[in-house]
Curated annotation (Swiss-Prot):
Its main location: cytoplasm. One of its GO terms (biological process) is regulation of DNA replication. Residues 1-68 are annotated as: Domain I, interacts with DnaA modulators. One of its GO terms (molecular function) is ATP hydrolysis activity. The gene is dnaA. The keyword ATP-binding applies. It is found in: Cytoplasm. This is Chromosomal replication initiator protein DnaA. Keywords: ATP-binding, Cytoplasm, DNA replication, DNA-binding, Lipid-binding, Nucleotide-binding. The keyword Nucleus does not apply. Belongs to the DnaA family.
Amino acid sequence: MENFWSLCLGRFEEELSAQQFNTWIKPLRFEAREGTLRLLAPNRFVQQWVKDRFLQKISALAEEVLSTPVQIELALYDASEKSPITLAKPKPAEAPGAAAKIEAEISKVTKTVSPAKPASAAPKKPKTLTETSGLNPAFRFDNFVTGKANQLARAAAIQVAENPGTAYNPLFIYGGVGLGKTHVLQAIGNHLKSQRPDAKIRYLHAERYVSDVVKAYEHKAFDEFKRQYHSLDLLLIDDIQFFAKKSRTQEEFFYAFNSLIEAKKQIIITCDTYPKEIADVDERLRTRFSWGLTVAVEPPELEMRVAILLKKAEAARVTLDEDVAFFIAKQVRSSVRELEGALNRIIAMANFTGHAIDVSLAKEALKDLIAVRGRQITIENIQKTVADYYKIKVAEMYSKKRSRNFARPRQIAMTLARELTNHSFPEIGEAFGGRHHTTVMHACDEIEQLRQNDQNVARDIAVLIQVIRD
């Protein structure tokens, strides 16, 4: 059962800033008793904070892995290790034997799929920034699945990893949540570390950098702060958009950026949007973000999603037929993280029920996801979202006007309808003013070409996909 908590720790460590993770999640203790998972907090403040903000996520993760509701109890332990004080009321106990089954299935799945980052043992003495790289060795180029959605980002990353400070400096990678930006970022660091073990490498989330600036300010230790950050060979900053409205942080990063670039040291940045569109960040920083190379990471296309699933199944030593992989890939389209979660659920259900993994079992395991997806995304919703985005009337989606101002958004909407729904080309054509299915096919081909060659179109589509799915 400890493996389940390791999975939770790994997921939260990936999604939260280091400060949030160390303050709220890492102090929790975990135990399992009679079909109930128990989390023990060190004090009432942490207990209430976790209950309000993270308990639902932990419960959802348990249900995602097991495809069955699991009781999560949040309690309080005192310093003398007495019986915990319960905050959350327990749900009805699982059926006899359920605890053993749950423990067995969590153990099997979490050992093979989505390995969590191991929790670090408390160091005997504090380490300086340059002694702690922050890298996760699990993120490497050899286990990163490449497709049209990320091939440019991967190629640029490899070039930078092999020639740091000379090619594409800075390298700016942008895209939505769960698309592999962090994987690419850390793969660069791990590659350089393997080639140059003595290199000073630092990976961190932008919020951690903000925290370091605050600490330096509080302790009047900016000389030490600058010495550590300005002496790096490779600086990897994740989610730079978190610098928004933090003027002192932006000022310090401006100095660090200039110092590293002048010394021909490599900087790599990830963000959820294009450099010029980052809100509430100083213009001089946004300009510098574009000095090197800017590349997008987009949602994976169907073939890439299938390849990701097959690779993860292989790593988990699970047999996954291509027809099952295609079925999963057609249902889960937004991110690699969601693909991973869907596969976890299917494997757990197969182990739990004793059935072989086939399309019918996959449908059962993902029935809630399929139902939600079916309710949320419709052609009408896509048409309205695209029309709003391009500031045209929805009626232009059905009209015969061929002006580029109307035709381009219409073609993009057709393409998104094909990607985000299960409708056929003829059905999509009918929804767009009774157009022939070949018109829809031509629109999809044309937009796909533009997507590969026009950065603005690629960015528009990535934004639209996120808006539609949210």
